[in-house]
Amino acid sequence: MEKALPSIAAPDLEITLVEKQSELLPTQGFADELRDQVREQLKELNIRLIEGSELAYLPPFNVGELGRFVVETKDGHRIEADMWFQCYGARPNTGYVAGTELQSAVRPDGALKVEPTLQVVGQTNIYAIGDVTDVRESKRADAARAQARIVISNISSQLSGKEPQATYNPSDEWVILPLGPEHGASQLLDSQGNSRILGPDQTAEIKGADLMVSVIRSQLNLP
């Protein structure tokens, strides 16, 4: 979605987003109200959104390479453009475990299979957290931090001669999605775990100014 941001800095650019799924932000758990907010703001920014379709063929230029071309989606939408970006097909970067004892824990999609304790399946003293795991949730920094706390607890138990007891339970989905410094929408969880939707003003206040770089710097004790 952030690929749409150049239209804010350079309003003369024509941006088209093609979403293969039937609706944008298809992750289970995201509210329709969130999607509606994002759709409306993309419209305000004159960004063309095509949902429920995909390119019938790839452009004749490499990703990020400048060159005029015309493509069509499988359901007939015509797109003229000068550059394209592939924002799909992410795969966990686990190639480095090939040929090691962890190879048997790698799923066909590249993710590492982990136990609820976050131990790699088949291993006692090897843990995995973050994007490489097969934990069924969106891959977020806060989720990786929460997983790290579970691993710390379990390693501490093992160092004390005890069995790992702490288990990781994915939280409900949430997202803070800025569309430039003044637009965006968010789905957050209140103290009771209920979802609430924030509009552009609140989203910009939380993340729009610096993409929360200052918050992360503070957490890491960086200047």
In which residue ranges do the predicted regions lie?
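C-terminal, flexible cofactor-proximal segment of oxidoreductases
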Residues: S138, Q147-P223
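Rossmann-like dinucleotide-binding cores of NAD(P)H-dependent redox enzymes
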Residues: M1-S53
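Alpha-helix termini
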Residues: E2-A10, F61-G64, Q158-P164
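Hydrophobic/aromatic beta-strand patches that form the interior of the parallel beta-sheet core
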Residues: T16-V18, I50, F85, Y127-I129, ...
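A conserved short coil-to-beta-strand element within the FAD-binding core of flavoproteins
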Residues: E51-L66
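FAD-site-proximal beta/loop scaffold in flavoenzymes
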Residues: R78-A146
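Glycine-centered tight beta-turn/hairpin loop motif at sheet-sheet or coil-to-beta transitions
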Residues: K74-G76
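Cofactor-binding loop segments of dinucleotide-utilizing enzymes, especially the Rossmann-like FAD-
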Residues: K20, D131, P181
